Amino acid sequence: MSQFNPMGGQSTTIQSSLVPIVVEQTARGERSYDIYSRLLKERVIFLVGQVEDHMANLVVAQLLFLEAENPDKDIHLYINSPGGSVTAGMSIYDTMQFIKPDVSTMCIGQACSMGSFLLSAGATGKRFCLPNARTMIHQPSGGAQGQASDIHIHAQEILKIRARLNEIMAKHTGKSVEEVARDTERDNFMSAEESKAYGLVDDVLYQRVPEESK
């Protein structure tokens, strides 16, 4: 497997020395992986921390890599994020929709702002939340300074982005655009069950469902 660091989305405060190493026995001897690289072999991707360009590029790279490995097998995206950059998040969103495999999403901890947006963008019927996880939706925010005309241009751009995000959120949740616009006017926090009722996820998982014996 290609060697790149899937920990790119993790907080920089986490020291690499704290990441567990998994050792496997193979026909060629022992092989060691950090735990996240080992989980990538199982088609598990972690989106953890702020959504920003570096983390988004790594998530996109992993999505494309797993599609190339097997275009017919699901990818599992675990999300624990307070949100972040809209453009970085949209690069992940567009890739999720572009690739052939279904992307199953799972909220662990929290999925706020762009995190909740990506959570809702998983394949229909394959969007999940753990029971004590929290989500939050709201409108995009930004700031500008300079000439009045430039500030006006930036304000208009934020409004266009907000309208587009509302359209996409409405598509994935089954809500109307008007409902989404109203519900994202301010920070709107939801429990796991409330997230399910709103349509951000399809189910709340209290324990792993055992696989059927073959």
UniProtKB/Swiss-Prot annotation:
rRNA-binding among keywords: no
Protein name: ATP-dependent Clp protease proteolytic subunit
Gene for this chain: clpP
Biological role: Cleaves peptides in various proteins in a process that requires ATP hydrolysis. Has a chymotrypsin-like activity. Plays a major role in the degradation of misfolded proteins.
Subcellular locations according to the entry: Cytoplasm
HAMAP family found in the cross-reference section: ClpP
Keyword Protease: yes
Subunit and partners: Fourteen ClpP subunits assemble into 2 heptameric rings which stack back to back to give a disk-like structure with a central cavity, resembling the structure of eukaryotic proteasomes.
E.C. numbers: 3.4.21.92
